A protein has these predicted regions:
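Beta-rich accessory regions
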Residues: 424, 429-432
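A contiguous binding-surface segment within folded domains or other stable secondary-structure elements
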Residues: 399
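Short, charged, surface-exposed hinge/linker loops at domain edges
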Residues: 439-453
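Formylglycine-dependent sulfatase
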Residues: 1-396, 404-425, 438-439, 454-492
Length: 492
């Protein structure tokens, strides 16, 4: 049987600003062509909208509170994946698969992510990336070993200048500079329409078009090497666009992202089922290892969607996803969790008394400067009041059919108490199953106090206590049942 290879292409800070996702402004012919040849997912979700954390979920099949990559990778602060985690590169190597990574890595330590072949770089030169892939393919041609190659692009991430996206950096002459006019840009609903936002979106679109050319270059090299006929191609992004209301938030603009998969010999289709980034590694293992993947997948939170890849109907078993964010930068502590169904989204903001923190690149942006200095009152980011962006309540509940921008919080709505209680319970059950240290009762981590549960002691729910009137007996609130931790089984 021919080797079953994988080419995993990961963009940096890319939302759905692509032609194949209905954006009429940004020119992305190569990505659009890939979508026309494969499956375009409309409901693919990152677990966290932060670079290192999101990439770690892709490469481990575990949420960040499970794998330890709580925030941006940093040896100085030891913000790294737990040493005991077996990542995709390690699991694949056990089965003789050649693994490689080109470009942005941004996870660690190296011992946990033992890619056999590395060409690490933050270059914007997508031709360079394609040539490194060519070298990798040539090595695979010589010995015939199956491979899983990951390419981490740096586009369309911001650069270190105000409003810049790396468009002035030197690149190969084969890369065309695709310019956009700010006055022509399409401002997404999650952003405010300001001159600074338009200027940055035009620069952002140029970086996306450069990324698109890189996708074309590398797919050509795959074809020339003769591997296109037996390689599963996966195109995705780590998190949403680097703007407020998106990156570092768990609102849909930050976590509902492009995912395109081309399976050899299959027709194009659109899949509307809800899949999570923790499902990517199980799917890769399924494709690359076949039956041998069963043992490796047992330790993962995700599940393979290979069998439902071409499903055009909404399936009951694929109707929700969970998400987990704790840090972005090491000083950006704001732990929050979510569950999203087809219609509703529930956020549990664990450290809700803290102001929502800024990522450095977003704080220095022209978009934020325009919003901060705007004369309108109240100030807004898109449809959201600025104060509601900074100061968030313990819980948020949104009806996405009627409120896709997640602005009108229904937590106190009498008509939505049943769905609130259901989603609250499902989220907490998931936190228990995944051993989440940030599941709290009265300010105490349940996981860290598991010995109390094991001893038969009751751990009260903070929702049983009226913090403004602690003398009140909340006997009308049923006690939450003590579930065991780490239950293996279905996502729900």
């Amino acid at each position: 049987m021919a080797a079953r290879n994988v080419l995993l292409l990961v963009a940096d800070d890319l939302g759905k600003q692509l032609g194949c996702y209905g954006n009429p402004y940004t020119k992305t012919p190569n990505i659009d062509k890939l979508a026309s040849e494969g499956v375009r997912f409309d409901n693919a979700f990152a677990s966290t909208a932060s670079c290192s954390g999101s990439r770690s979920t892709i490469y481990t099949g575990l949420h960040t509170h499970q794998n330890g990559q709580y925030g941006l990778n940093s040896g100085k602060h030891h913000f790294m994946t737990f040493d005991h985690i077996e990542s995709g590169p390690a699991l694949l190597a056990k089965n003789g698969v050649r693994t490689g990574i080109i470009g942005k890595v941004h996870v660690g330590p190296d011992a946990v992510y033992p890619w056999e072949w590395r060409a690490e770089s933050l270059t914007r030169d997508v031709w360079w990336s394609a040539q490194r892939a060519k070298e990798f393919f040539e090595a695979s041609q010589k010995d015939g070993r199956p491979f899983v190659l990951t390419v981490g692009y740096h586009d369309p991430h911001r650069d270190r200048t105000r409003g810049g996206f790396g468009n002035d950096e030197p690149v190969d002459d084969r890369i065309q500079s695709v310019k956009y006019r700010p006055e022509d840009t399409v401002v997404p609903e999650f952003l405010s329409d300001t001159p600074g936002a338009r200027q940055e979106l035009a620069e952002y679109a140029e970086a996306i078009s450069r990324l698109d050319q890189g996708i074309g270059f590398i797919l050509k090299e795959l074809e020339v090497a003769g591997f296109a006929k037996d390689t599963l191609v996966i195109f995705m992004s780590d998190n949403g666009p680097p703007f407020m209301n998106s990156k570092t938030t768990l609102y849909d603009a930050g976590v509902r992202l492009p995912l395109i998969i081309r399976q050899p010999g299959s027709k194009s289709s659109v899949n509307t089922n809800l899949v999570s980034y923790v499902d990517i590694l199980p799917t890769i293992l399924d494709w690359a290892l076949g039956q041998a993947s069963q043992e490796a997948k047992k330790q993962l939170s995700g599940r393979s969607f290979l069998q439902v890849l071409h499903e055009v109907k909404d399936l009951a078993d694929w109707d929700h996803v969970f998400g987990s964010h704790t840090f972005h930068e090491s000083t950006n502590y704001w732990p929050t969790r979510f569950i999203r169904t087809r219609r509703y989204k529930y956020h549990r903001n664990i450290a809700w008394r803290l102001d929502f923190p800024f990522a450095n690149d977003i704080y220095g942006s022209l978009t934020w400067e325009d919003i901060r200095n705007a004369e309108e009152s109240p100030k807004k980011i898109g449809q959201r009041k600025l104060k509601d962006y900074f100061f968030r309540p313990p819980e948020e509940l949104y009806d996405l059919d009627n409120d896709p921008q997640e602005v009108t919080n229904l937590v106190k709505s009498p008509d939505h108490q049943e769905i609130l209680e259901e989603l609250r319970g499902r989220l907490e059950d998931w936190q228990r199953r995944t051993n989440d240290p940030w599941l709290y009762r009265d300010g105490i981590s349940i996981l860290l106090n598991k010995h109390h549960l094991d001893a038969g002691l009751e751990v009260p729910d903070k929702w049983d206590l009226d913090i403004e009137h602690p003398e009140t007996n909340r006997g009308d609130v049923p006690k939450y049942k003590n579930l065991p931790f780490g239950i293996a089984g279905a996502r729900d």
